[in-house]
Design a protein with these regions (language model features):
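Conserved serine/cysteine hydrolase catalytic core
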Residues: 194-248
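Conserved alpha/beta-hydrolase catalytic His-Asp/Glu region
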Residues: 144-148, 156-215
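Glycine-rich His-Gly loop
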Residues: 43-46, 112, 226
Length: 278
């Protein structure tokens, strides 16, 4: 009954404990934490998304690891910040969270825009506190560039933001998700102000900056992507001595850890067991 009320697709309801910290520029950030022990996973979500989109992973993986999921500034339950919606400040937010979590290196798991935030963290703050990187379904600046949209925007009246966000959220999944859960996710995404959302899609660096970032680390890297990123994945695998790739099918959508949580977690556990914490 609880699962039905929450509208959650096959996982527990409120996984983990809510925690907060204040950044060096005075912004109160929220994160979810579950599990204990010396092995810590830090999940960083995508554009406008809340930390609880990883709720299934927090519940499952916290049986073995300490698991943290961040609400980036102006997302989820974090404070709507007046500034800092760029790669430099958001990288600093991750660095300050990692420092707060303790002295042992962590595995940072970035999804979508969280891939770029994670790469910015490594490039600007180094990988001294990083045990490994897991980069999910976004460009890492390798060749070839991202393909153009399959369906270019048609001229005409702009859709209301609420409609656009609803379509965006539903488009992240290849499998059917409960309507109540999708509506909850849409409302969470709409909490990010429109101007902030625009800024987050316009980080002022060339795409080669991200390539240099991923090659700046010698830590193990798992690049888990759908077919649209096959070219970048193959180049990264061939050129980066510490990288490996997991090429998924189009049976999963952009939020592949929601569409196939068991498969995602199995791949992640295998990587951690072989490359990070044998």
């Amino acid at each position: 009954m609880l699962l039905l009320l929450l509208g959650w697709p096959g996982a527990v309801g409120a996984a983990g404990q809510s925690r907060h910290f204040t950044t060096s520029d005075g912004v109160r950030l929220h994160y979810i934490e579950a599990g204990t022990g010396p092995r810590t996973l830090v999940f960083v979500p995508g554009w406008s998304m809340p930390a609880w989109i990883f709720e299934r992973q927090v519940a499952s993986l916290s049986r073995e690891f300490r698991v943290v999921a961040l609400d980036p500034r102006s997302q989820g339950q974090s404070e709507i910040a007046r500034a800092g919606h760029d790669h430099v400040r958001r990288a600093g937010d991750i660095a300050e969270l990692v420092a707060r979590l303790g002295p042992r290196p962590v595995v940072v798991v970035g999804w979508s825009l969280g891939v770029l935030d994670t790469l910015a963290y490594v490039r600007l703050h180094g990988d001294g506190q990083v045990a490994a990187l897991v980069l999910i379904d976004n460009s890492v600046g390798e060749e070839p560039p991202p393909p153009p949209p399959a369906q270019p925007m048609k001229p005409g009246p702009k859709l209301p933001r609420e409609v656009m966000m609803k379509n965006f959220v539903r488009g992240m999944f290849a499998t059917r998700q409960p309507d109540a859960w999708l509506e909850r996710l849409t409302q969470a995404a709409l909490r990010t102000p429109e101007e902030v959302a625009r800024q987050l899609l316009a980080y002022p660096v060339p795409r080669t900056w991200w390539r240099e970032a991923v090659y700046s680390t010698s830590r193990p890297v798992l690049y888990m992507v759908r077919p649209k990123w096959t070219g970048q994945a193959e180049n990264l695998r061939d050129k980066h001595p510490s990288a490996e790739v997991a090429l998924l099918s189009n049976a999963v959508g952009h939020a592949l850890f929601v569409d196939d949580p068991a498969g995602f977690e199995a791949r992640l556990r295998d990587f951690l067991r072989r490359r990070v914490w044998p």
